[in-house]
Amino acid sequence: MSVDHTRAPVLEALVDYRRRGRLSFTPPGHKQARGADPAVREVLGDAVFLGDVLAAGGLDDRLTRGQVLERAEKLMADAVHAEHTFFTTCGSSLSVKAAMLSVAGPHEKLLVGRDAHKSVVSGLVLAGIEPVWVEPRWDAERHLAHPPAPEDFARAFAAHPDAKGALVTSPTPYGACADLRGIAQVCHGRRLPLIVDEAWGAHLPFHPDLPSWAMDAGADICVTSIHKMGSGLEQGSVFHVQGDLVPPQLLKNRSDLLGTTSPSVLIYAGLDGWRRQMALRGRELMGGALELAAEVRGAIEEIDGLHVNDRDDFCGAGLADDFDPLPTIIDISGIGVTGYRAADWLREHREVEMHLVDHRRIGAQITHGDDRETTGELLAALKELARIAPDLRDAPEVDVPSPAELRLEQVALPRDAFFGSAEDVPVAEAAGRIAAEMITPYPPGIPAVLPGERLTEPVLRYLRTGLGAGMYLPDPGDPELESVRVVK
């Protein structure tokens, strides 16, 4: 049966809701903006409130007989060649947890790349899953981690034949991509499922010059944040499933366990609209973004002291398998300024927001929403940054450990350490103790310390010096990291 991608069930249902002038005696209590605070209405506009209706008993009837959401999800699945798709309004942080709970349970093993996002670790804590960490490919020269390779997963399965499946992150926030097809083959040779955290890859299915995406590569579950590289609203996420290793109803059940019973129709509408936009114009829009990104990369490379990381930097033996050029990662070590200091200056003095920031890099993601006006402002700001860089060089330095020093020993299950008896100790006394909390430089959100890992002096020094240089640590109990929560 042919699929009509000009349709957008959620958006159409919202139009119908307004046309009918339905009178609501249900939540939300603002009653189509009438009860909202005037100052909020002035800032947000009434359109936000007019679109904020119940999914069941509002957008659809109380028994969801119109199947508004189901039809939108089927269209999304068709657009990206998945067998089944589910929308979520709690971000991929929820979606990836639901995927993990569909594959492994308490005290069961799951192979996980150690470059996973903190939401994956949260899933381990909640479920009591035992992680078998698969080491990323470390680029010691650039102090950067790339996804593990198929042979890394094969070795981990050989050492842990009782593992229930695997999870890999690809692309990374830096744009480095794994050999997903090879990893899927390793998993499927054992009749085990592969989960791909593809939060940064919503755009990948829509242009042949972009890296292969998870469903095409044979993954069983793929988690995607439509709000990151797509046109969705914040928290808009989908997960796709295919094959016979993870029943779709099981995945939906696990998502229902974690998700809200009051999903945002606004977020659903953003997901539905993104799918239609990409199904009808995706190749054109992504092609334009790729051309623009290539121009921007070339222009930045001409600025003294700046270097744009490219395929030659990220791909090759012992590195990543593929590369997404839209996250424009700029190495600014040549101008002697940390990424933290540079990002703060760009925001304060040029009103330019950078996304990814670390001790030597800043990142500007280029999407189909950019044009030569936005990128022109970016380039002008970067030229000015390079010019005034000598004035910013008095910032504290970050003591970055070697790849071997960054790897901590896991001596307890994350869940056991997180929920067990714990105490706060001065950071000077924490080395050798077992962490009872996550400590995560953000962005990109990859924990440096996990619950259950044995703390070491190099990692603690890295975090303390990073904090002094401008690193953001959102999760430790002591935000100044003068103390650390450890297992008693």
What residue ranges belong to the model's regions?
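PLP-dependent enzyme catalytic core of the Aspartate aminotransferase-like
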Residues: 345-349, 355-488
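Generic beta-strand/beta-sheet core signal
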Residues: 113, 134, 169, 197, ...
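Conserved N-terminal alpha-helix of the aminotransferase class I/II PLP-enzyme fold
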Residues: 44-94, 115
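Conserved small-domain helix->loop->beta segment predominantly found in fold-type I
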Residues: 284-363, 367-368, 390-409
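Short, glycine-/Ser/Thr-/acidic-enriched flexible segments
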Residues: 32, 173, 228-229, 244-246, ...
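Short acidic (Asp/Glu) and glycine-rich catalytic loops that position anionic groups and cofactors
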Residues: 248-252, 270-279, 321-326, 356-362, ...
